[in-house]
């Protein structure tokens, strides 16, 4: 049974039936509830909703963009991912003065959205200035600026100073390998000192992982599923000898991930968030040789935009299909250490069956 789509449909219905009308920064208007949760066991399938078709490649591209520590939309555009176009364009329009827009069209300072995107792709100087979104997710995950000054060199009689930059993702992986029972296995994107420098403060602002030991029987079942030969039968009463190297590198622990989200665009954004953190959990588990266990989303302001209500009602009426299975290429490079060596084609969802896409406008 696909319990994930069912939970999601129940959440949409909850918002429609119990939500309060609220204004919002986009001027669109929402109906909203507060404090909800999504829980999914990864053993039941990969958490990619089936009640509407999901843009898998765009989803993977965005997560790889985060893991690269990138904050410029050029990489996204080169991979045909347009999730952040509206935010970048809004930032561009807000910073080009009206008088420049009116009198300087020939210098390409008054561009349409389409021309703006094309210019990002073709002009590296323009992309560097206008394609960057500020210190958003990738910067905080991989390059958190601690503001702690250190000497990085000398220029004659003078010291040259820099600041300590923290790679939270690499630290998380190291901590999982050295202290998997720690209660500090967290990553935050909510850098208060830099919020005003971002085109949009993080909606999903942090996540925590949690690990527990697998039982011998759980380990044997995992080993069997990965190594069985034709004719072998799984026997639950078997007690394997894991001191024997024959069973290595069967995982010894399982890992869960819980993310926190202050603002939840429930129709367009949440399905992406669920699958994206599901993929992140799979990637982290792969890095530390653990088994993905549970995915949990703690959701704050959970809303539907007023121009998404009919689309949500349509999705509620659809019957879910079975969830797909994720396959990650068996490449040697670490996804965390070398995300630039990975592409969306390295992440495949098998047996994905879904209903058609339901289009809805994006509010920026």
How would you name each of these model-derived features?
Residues 1-364:
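Terminal, non-catalytic protein-protein interaction segments that mediate quaternary/complex assembly
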